[in-house]
Amino acid sequence: MAGLRPPLPDATSDGFLAEALAEANAHRAKHHAPPLVLDPELVEYARSRAASRSEYPDTQAGHDGLREGTGENLFWGAGSKKRPLAAGKAVAEWYDEIKGYDFGNPENVADCGHFTQLVWKGSRRMGAGRVAGQGPVFFETYIIFVFEEPGNKLGRFAENVRPA
């Protein structure tokens, strides 16, 4: 699908990637999931996904066009400060969805899919990408994490999303 506006500039840095991996793995450790490994090919894919998502307002593009076999978490933030938001901000918002996850009824995940993908035990590799720049009103940041193996598979939540 063609975008509504040009993509925002890439803002993926080594520091951003280090923070993304550290933040993700800190939360995964709480849930007895093995640490993720940063995969260079997935980093490039996440960067391209962040750019393409930024061609649309906020998160309107959703997960359209996501390649098969890949999980994805999407974050959008905007504000008056002219600097990209940190990976930790995205991870904190995704992890906060734990409030909606019922470990006693693990198949009901309508409002907590970012959390469950983040801590999904079966995911072993990740990539992260960030774009940021001036939007129509505010300075905008899009952050994408991609995962392989993808999470959120029906019938597999209890084994892959463990209590802290």
Q: What do these predicted regions represent?
A:
Residues 1-7:
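Extracellular cell-wall/glycan-interacting regions and their flexible linkers
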Residues 8-71:
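Short, well-ordered surface patches within globular domains
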Residues 11, 78-81, 135:
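Conserved, non-catalytic sequence blocks in retroelement Pol enzymes and Pol-derived host proteins
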Residues 25, 47-50, 75, 91-95, ...:
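Non-transmembrane alpha-helical segments in soluble domains
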Residues 36, 74, 118:
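Short clusters of hydrophobic/aromatic residues that line enzyme substrate/ligand-binding pockets
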Residues 51-54, 79, 95, 99:
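Generic short alpha-helical segment signal, independent of protein family or function
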Residues 67-93:
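Peptidoglycan-targeting cell-wall enzymes and recognition modules
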Residues 83-164:
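Disulfide-stabilized extracellular recognition modules
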